[in-house]
Each structure stands twice: as structure tokens, then as C-alpha cells.
């Protein structure tokens, strides 16, 4: 319940900079990472982790040799995530901006990520920030990698993500309140 009130307070203070009124449910969190073959994943990046419900699912499933980079801009959320996942040697919680992701990974000796999991409210971003985000994703995502994006607006943004990716699928999760889902996007387009 503490996470809910922290999240709600951030939402009212920062509006659409916070993706939701509340943290993702366990069902939505599992749906968002359901396509990841955990035994083969080498690098997973999570953007906008908030209080960490998706991060927890990643922690429960990832093997110890897989590097997990969690990027969170909000200092309170980043501090909370560092505390929650301090015992995970393969986890690195970074307080920072998504536009700096390439440098953040390079500083850690990482060239590419197998999966980028996003809890960011991307469609609410200004157009230039959207383009910046997907330029960075194009730089860091392995050619066979997937960009996983959670949404509380089921199916509404299919066309939006198709502007940036060759292949976009959507999985609905009705048990989340409000009903939500995840987009699974592959093949970042050359230009957008």
C-alpha cells in the first residue's frame, strides 16, 4: 500500500511524467516480460521502473549472469529501487535520463541489450523526446532484441509504435486496474 501512495503522490505532482496512478499489478508485470527467454538473456534494461513491480518479476526470473540495468529518473523511486534490489549483484539501478542510456551502458562495458522494458509514458512525451528515446533504443537494442512497453490504453497506441518499429504485437491484461497490456516491438525503423 505504501508503494501505491508514493506512486499516486508522484502522479499528482508530476502528471503525465508518471505513467500511471498506481504501480503495475503483478499480472501486468508478468505480461510485460512474458516474451523474454530468461535462460538466454544477457542484458535486460528497464526504463522508468517506478517502485519496481516489473523489476521484481525480472529479479525473480533472470539468471545470475544476466546484467540488469534499471534506469529511473525520479530520485525517490531510484533510491527505493536501490534498497529493494541491493542484494542482486547483477542489478544496477541508475538515476538518470533515458537520453543518456547509450553512455550509461558503455560506462558499464555493455554494447547492446537483448530487451528494453519500458514503463515510461512514451506517447505522452513531446515528439522530440519520443524521437530521442527511439534513437537511443535503436543504438542499444540488439538486432534480434525486443522493446517491451506497458500501457494502460489497450490497442490505442498500436499505430503509434508502428511508426517506430517494423513489427508490433499487443497482449491485453484485463486483470490490471485499469485494464492494460504490453506492446512487444521489434525492428527499429531506419527513419521516423
From Swiss-Prot:
* Species assigned in the record: Singulisphaera acidiphila (strain ATCC BAA-1392 / DSM 18658 / VKM B-2454 / MOB10)
Q: Which Pfam families match?
A: Methyltransf_25
**So what family is this one in?**
Belongs to the methyltransferase superfamily.
UniProt-listed CDD domains: AdoMet_MTases (cd02440)
- Gene coding for it: olsG
Record's function text: Catalyzes the 3-fold methylation of ornithine lipids. Forms ornithine lipids that are mono-, di-, and trimethylated on the delta-nitrogen of the ornithine head group.
- Enzyme Commission number: 2.1.1.344
Q: Which GO molecular-function terms appear in the entry?
A: rRNA (adenine-N6,N6-)-dimethyltransferase activity
Presence of keyword Hydrolase = no
The catalytic activity, as recorded, is:
an N(2)-[(3R)-3-(2-saturated-acyloxy)acyl]-L-ornithine lipid + 3 S-adenosyl-L-methionine = an N,N,N-trimethylornithine lipid + 3 S-adenosyl-L-homocysteine + 3 H(+)
What is this protein's pH dependence?
A: Optimum pH is 8.
Keyword annotations of the record: Methyltransferase, S-adenosyl-L-methionine, Transferase
- According to UniProt, the name of this protein is Ornithine lipid N-methyltransferase
